[in-house]
């Protein structure tokens, strides 16, 4: 059925297409990311050449590199691939928890890898800022709360965050909430503390690091969802949740392809408490209205 949520999705698609050809906006966003990442030598953001740019043309500096799935990447040492993977996941966390500004199109065409003489000089080139989207705490706050609740395996906290996002249909059966909580708790295993909540043994090495390249997590999530018929009780998901899920899946896929071996919890944990009190207050406000 054509619902308000569905119409909001159509409006969002139209807005995304408009932003993709708004070169003034993309140039502004590119400059912004170049500025906030200027002190982080792991990342390269092209420079906008104003002299040759206009409303219809955006001219940038040429930045060399190889594609993420180039065979040369897997020839790098494990340490170097871990360095790259950690950098991309940390960037994802900064977008979600710190900046409220997210690259909503995390396909590999938006990245290049610049291989240095050693891991200290490997860099990630960030391209195409046309799909950057700003979020306010009204919409991203409950999404962050879903991440925190999943990380702590806190089903009640997760339920409140879902309610704040209007995620489920009215009066969902308790079994559905239990099944969806279990799905979220499994989905976050890549960022989970393996000592608290161990994932399947085949995705950990002897040091307790997550084997992203061997992970079959998406398949397990799909199987769990279809097994429990979760989709029967869902409204059209809020677009903000889909953007967040797509962002996290994009980061997961990046680390999966380059076969990183990284404990995700050591990346996520420094960000978990950012905006936490405000996010919890926002969830309470939205669920009590």
Range-by-range predicted roles:
Residues 1-69, 87, 98-99:
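Conserved ATP-binding subdomain of kinase catalytic cores across diverse folds
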Residues 11-13, 54, 63-67, 71-87, ...:
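Helix-rich C-lobe and terminal helical cap/extension of kinase-like folds
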Residues 26, 59, 107, 128, ...:
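Residue-level signature of catalytic and energy-coupling elements of molecular machines
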Residues 35, 102-103, 256-260:
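Juxtamembrane "helix exit" motif at the C-terminal ends of alpha-helical transmembrane segments
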Residues 55, 109-110:
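Conserved protein-kinase catalytic-loop position immediately C-terminal to the HRD catalytic Asp
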Residues 57, 103, 124:
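Hydrophobic "anchor" residues on beta-strands that sit immediately upstream
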Residues 98-108:
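Catalytic-loop of the protein kinase fold
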